[in-house]
């Protein structure tokens, strides 16, 4: 498995790039988000990668961050979404934007990505709910990835009780870090009832 490449960027032709690693040129497809963040040709670059092996080809996909690669891996697990479609989605929106769209069940936003219709967008919401986490705080609803397993367990419990992911994450913000799951759920429910 090729997990990461560090070398000199020798070619940039969207969506493909070539990185020279000790005399071996690795061709990788990258999202446009990654492509626009690449340095000029001739400079050093590091890419996180995902190798997809099919009967007829070995395909290497590159990502600027490990988080983008993780999101790609989640996307290709969704029925009806292949590697090229997943790359198209990550070209249309950042990993954080995708996580927010899934959490908010924004089917319209998801179906605006190339190759994604309404049914596939609905399937994405269903299959990715709770698996993607936004890592930037923009509207006060999303914080960094949960700091402890307890936080994830509290959110999961609230989801099982029928609350939306958005409500659950907002409620958990008022729970002190390190609180055990039982007490955390109680405090989160109290926050929801305010």
Swiss-Prot record:
GO biological process: DNA recombination; DNA repair; SOS response
SMART domains for the chain: HhH1 (SM00278)
Start and end residues of each stretch annotated as Domain III: 147-194
Region spans: Flexible linker: 144-147
Database matches in SUPFAM superfamilies: DNA helicase RuvA subunit, C-terminal domain (SSF46929), Nucleic acid-binding proteins (SSF50249), RuvA domain 2-like (SSF47781)
Keyword DNA repair applies: yes
Annotated stretches, region: Domain I: 1-64
GO cellular component assignments: cytoplasm; Holliday junction helicase complex; Holliday junction resolvase complex
Principal subcellular localization: cytoplasm
This protein's UniProt keywords: Cytoplasm, DNA damage, DNA recombination, DNA repair, DNA-binding
Pfam families attached to this UniProt entry: HHH_5, RuvA_C, RuvA_N
Domain of life: Bacteria
Keyword DNA-binding: yes
TM ranges: none
Protein localization: Cytoplasm
Region entry Domain II, spans: 65-143
InterPro entries according to UniProt: DNA_helicase_Holl-junc_RuvA_I, Hlx-hairpin-Hlx_DNA-bd_motif, NA-bd_OB-fold, RuvA, RuvA_2-like, RuvA_C, RuvA_C_sf
UniProt cross-references to HAMAP family, sorted A to Z: DNA_HJ_migration_RuvA
UniProt-listed NCBIfam families: ruvA
Similarity field: Belongs to the RuvA family.
Domain comment in the entry: Has three domains with a flexible linker between the domains II and III and assumes an 'L' shape. Domain III is highly mobile and contacts RuvB.
Subunit structure: Homotetramer. Forms an RuvA(8)-RuvB(12)-Holliday junction (HJ) complex. HJ DNA is sandwiched between 2 RuvA tetramers; dsDNA enters through RuvA and exits via RuvB. An RuvB hexamer assembles on each DNA strand where it exits the tetramer. Each RuvB hexamer is contacted by two RuvA subunits (via domain III) on 2 adjacent RuvB subunits; this complex drives branch migration. In the full resolvosome a probable DNA-RuvA(4)-RuvB(12)-RuvC(2) complex forms which resolves the HJ.
Function field: The RuvA-RuvB-RuvC complex processes Holliday junction (HJ) DNA during genetic recombination and DNA repair, while the RuvA-RuvB complex plays an important role in the rescue of blocked DNA replication forks via replication fork reversal (RFR). RuvA specifically binds to HJ cruciform DNA, conferring on it an open structure. The RuvB hexamer acts as an ATP-dependent pump, pulling dsDNA into and through the RuvAB complex. HJ branch migration allows RuvC to scan DNA until it finds its consensus sequence, where it cleaves and resolves the cruciform DNA.
Protein name: Holliday junction branch migration complex subunit RuvA
Organism: Neisseria meningitidis serogroup B (strain ATCC BAA-335 / MC58)
């Amino acid at each position: 498995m090729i997990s990461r490449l560090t070398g000199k960027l020798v070619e940039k032709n969207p969506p493909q790039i070539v990185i020279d690693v000790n005399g071996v040129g690795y061709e990788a497809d990258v999202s446009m988000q990654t492509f626009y963040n690449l340095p000029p040709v001739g400079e050093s670059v590091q890419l996180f990668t995902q190798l997809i092996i099919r009967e007829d080809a070995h395909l290497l996909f590159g990502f600027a961050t490990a988080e983008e690669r993780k999101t790609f891996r989640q996307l290709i697990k969704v029925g009806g979404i292949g590697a090229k479609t997943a790359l198209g989605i990550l070209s249309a929106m950042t990993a954080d934007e995708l996580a927010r769209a899934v959490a908010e069940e924004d089917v319209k936003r998801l179906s605006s990505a190339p190759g994604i219709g309404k049914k596939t967008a609905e399937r994405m919401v269903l299959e990715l709910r709770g698996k993607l986490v936004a890592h930037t705080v923009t509207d006060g609803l999303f914080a960094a990835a949960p700091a402890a397993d307890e936080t994830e367990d509290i959110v999961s419990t609230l989801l099982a009780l029928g609350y939306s992911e958005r409500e659950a994450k907002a409620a958990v913000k008022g729970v002190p870090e390190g609180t055990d799951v039982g007490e955390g759920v109680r405090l989160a429910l109290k926050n929801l009832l305010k």
